Amino acid sequence: MQFSIVYFLVFLIPSTQSTGFLSLKLTSDHDCLVHLEIQSMEYSETVRLLAYETKSLEIFTPEITNQLSIHFQILHHFSGVSLSDVSSQLFKLDNNGIWEPRVIDSDQVILSIQSNFHCQKGFYGPICERRSRSTSTIKTTTSIPTATSSPFHLPISEVQINNLIIYAVLSSVVLLLIIANCFLCFCRPKPSKYIDYTFQNVFPMDEFFPMEKTIGSPDTEYFDSSSRYYSTITLQSRV
């Protein structure tokens, strides 16, 4: 009878197991490689860190105890030579929303570690040991656009067409102004040039000086009778 009661209590009380994620933030003061290893989960990973660079990791913890042991080892960033001994760190899988800091101090590199544990979706409780059985229904509403629009808002297509019309009109006006300016610059009338052929003193020469020819005088004048208007040529000859 006592054995049956104990057997019943074992199946009635849930075991202390958790299902969630252990988040880690790693920061170092020098360039290095950090090698992580979890023997209970057959998990291993190597992370490259630059100086004062923070990298985040998430380790899935399915159905394990409320504590997790992780082995850390700091390596040289280029050669991979060990810069510290293997350090075993024990993390509590406590879903309290608090980041717990810790430091691994070696001779050459200081490694800062921040840890936080949070439950997987569908689990809750201090160590994520309880599974949620409630289901939530989400109502989604899809709005179908109608063809009618409010009188104060134009459809996007009409607004685009109106903008194109306005741009076309403005472009045409600017083009016409440019053509008109070019026409005025290259086709304006040139200033006229003329020669005044009027003579102030025009008179017939044969009315005052008849044709004559003087021989033997030092000055000989010849009169051109074919032209009656101011076409006298005077030649002087010296003997």
UniProtKB/Swiss-Prot annotation:
Keywords of this entry: Developmental protein
* GO BP term, pick one: mesendoderm development
InterPro entries in the record: Mesendoderm_Regulator
Q: What does this protein do?
A: May have a role in mesendoderm development during embryogenesis.
**What name does UniProt use for this protein?**
Skn-1 dependent zygotic transcript 1 protein
Q: Which organism is it from?
A: Caenorhabditis briggsae
